[in-house]
Amino acid sequence: MLDPASAPSAAVHRLAGLLAVLGWAALIVQAWFSITRHITLGNGAAYGVMMYTGYFTILTNTLCAGVATALALGGRTTPPWHTLRRPAVITAAAVSILLVGVIYHLLLRDIHHPVGLERACNVVLHYLVPPLFVLLWWIAVPRGALVWRDLWPAFAFPAVYALYVLARGELAGVYPYPFFDVTKIGYASVLWNAAGLSAVFVATGCVMLALKRSSTTR
């Protein structure tokens, strides 16, 4: 499999570096808000960490920040970072972060109203990182590097997340998103929502890969 870092461009390094700084900064500040909020509420720091790591936005942005860091560093990394530079992994992150932005804007922005610095972090995680990372994917993944089987990581990542959220909800009784809240809408509705989101992920991944593959013929 081709490695984007084998022939890095200045544009990839610059954009990846920008995304790494933006992503990690927003994630760290958001973690601080979550932990301190739950300490204030008497739930404790561990509960704050649990709530923080329950959001697909956070996990996907963490993956994107890791990929961006690996691309920014290029060959100056150890083997674990090499995995994050694989075209299939970059593509999985791109599909997920694109849908993070779209789903938040369409379904969640009217029920989420952060203020101050937390609002700035929200803008970074939901509105800046998604388009910038998709652009990074487009210029970082070499032409001809992707085949259709490379979409499996893009589908596996949200599928594993859905199982994680449902298992965590059974144990802790908390769900990060209303469309996954079994206690309010029941398992039947949650499964229908999961099926619908799965179809969206599959369609998005297929369209993105088709566009990327079509660019090789130009």
Q: Whereabouts are the PLM-identified features?
A:
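N-terminal membrane topogenic signal
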Residues: D3-L19, S215
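Membrane-interface transmembrane-helix boundary segments in multi-pass integral membrane proteins
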Residues: A11, M51-G54, A172-V207
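Alpha-helical transmembrane segments of multi-pass membrane proteins
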Residues: V21-H38
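Juxtamembrane "helix-exit" motif on the non-cytosolic side of transmembrane helices
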Residues: S34-I39, H105-P114
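Non-cytosolic membrane-interface motifs at loop->transmembrane helix junctions
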Residues: G44-M51, R85-R86, H112-L125, W148-D150, ...
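Membrane-interface loop-to-helix entry segments
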Residues: F56-L59, E118-P131, L191-A195
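Interfacial segments of alpha-helical transmembrane regions
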Residues: T78-S96, V147-F155
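Alpha-helical transmembrane segments in multipass membrane proteins, preferentially the mid-helix core
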Residues: P130-L146
